Amino acid sequence: MKIDILTLFPEMFAPLEHSIVGKAKEKGLLDIHYHNFRDYAEKARHVDDEPYGGGQGMLLRAQPIFDTIEQIEVKKPRIILLDPAGKPFTQAYAEELALEEELIFICGHYEGYDERIKTLVTDEISLGDFVLTGGELAAMTIVDATVRLIPQVLGKESSHQDDSFSSGLLEYPQYTRPYDYRGMTVPDVLMSGHHERIRLWRLEESLRKTYLRRPDLLERYDFSEEERKLLDKIKEALG
């Protein structure tokens, strides 16, 4: 995968040189470049200007963004604008982006964008109902969530399949050594070696956590008969 990021602050992306994204680069599975679009700005390197019609703040000008993208050597990229008014980012969205060969991210600052920038864009993405100072943190989040889904990036192809949201449910609780820590013990079922009982316990715990913390996810979840019975059992136990 090739990723190009347009930003006024390339140095903010240093964390992507580490952990999973850094390993993806080392394996040759990811090629990532940062472009300071101030370098392409006309008018004394100004990237922002006052909005026509008046209003608060400054807007990102179209010219630096257009010129930066036009010099990037790509074929058919997904061009992503980070915008609080965009489509909410989800695990399913990350899975979709992980299938792409080329991604371009536009990280804004200031009050907003000249609307004409959006003629370049294929996707407008938001992390949620809040506003960040710029698009850099959002871009890093999306890159991390996407790159880890590229085949061969994680140690095992199944490593991400049990993650929260990948199945549509929140992930079940997990434990490691020691068995007893300060009086808190590992559930006996996980020590039993009985694979079917462990599977059912994990499924029930996933359903329980999702029901208690994110019931909205269950509204669009496609239940199997087994899952429906387990959820009914959970609801009855909780009263």
Swiss-Prot record:
<comment type="similarity">
    <text>Belongs to the RNA methyltransferase TrmD family.</text>
</comment>
<dbReference type="GO" id="GO:0052906">
    <property type="term" value="F:tRNA (guanine(37)-N1)-methyltransferase activity"/>
</dbReference>
<keyword id="KW-0819">tRNA processing</keyword>
<dbReference type="Pfam" id="PF01746">
    <property type="entry name" value="tRNA_m1G_MT"/>
</dbReference>
<feature type="binding site">
    <location>
        <begin position="127"/>
        <end position="132"/>
    </location>
    <ligand>
        <name>S-adenosyl-L-methionine</name>
    </ligand>
</feature>
<keyword id="KW-0949">S-adenosyl-L-methionine</keyword>
<dbReference type="InterPro" id="IPR029028">
    <property type="entry name" value="Alpha/beta_knot_MTases"/>
</dbReference>
<dbReference type="GO" id="GO:0005829">
    <property type="term" value="C:cytosol"/>
</dbReference>
<comment type="subunit">
    <text>Homodimer.</text>
</comment>
<keyword id="KW-0963">Cytoplasm</keyword>
<dbReference type="InterPro" id="IPR002649">
    <property type="entry name" value="tRNA_m1G_MeTrfase_TrmD"/>
</dbReference>
<dbReference type="GO" id="GO:0002939">
    <property type="term" value="P:tRNA N1-guanine methylation"/>
</dbReference>
<dbReference type="InterPro" id="IPR016009">
    <property type="entry name" value="tRNA_MeTrfase_TRMD/TRM10"/>
</dbReference>
<dbReference type="InterPro" id="IPR023148">
    <property type="entry name" value="tRNA_m1G_MeTrfase_C_sf"/>
</dbReference>
<dbReference type="InterPro" id="IPR029026">
    <property type="entry name" value="tRNA_m1G_MTases_N"/>
</dbReference>
<protein>
    <recommendedName>
        <fullName>tRNA (guanine-N(1)-)-methyltransferase</fullName>
        <ecNumber>2.1.1.228</ecNumber>
    </recommendedName>
</protein>
<keyword id="KW-0489">Methyltransferase</keyword>
<comment type="function">
    <text>Specifically methylates guanosine-37 in various tRNAs.</text>
</comment>
<keyword id="KW-0808">Transferase</keyword>
<feature type="binding site">
    <location>
        <position position="108"/>
    </location>
    <ligand>
        <name>S-adenosyl-L-methionine</name>
    </ligand>
</feature>
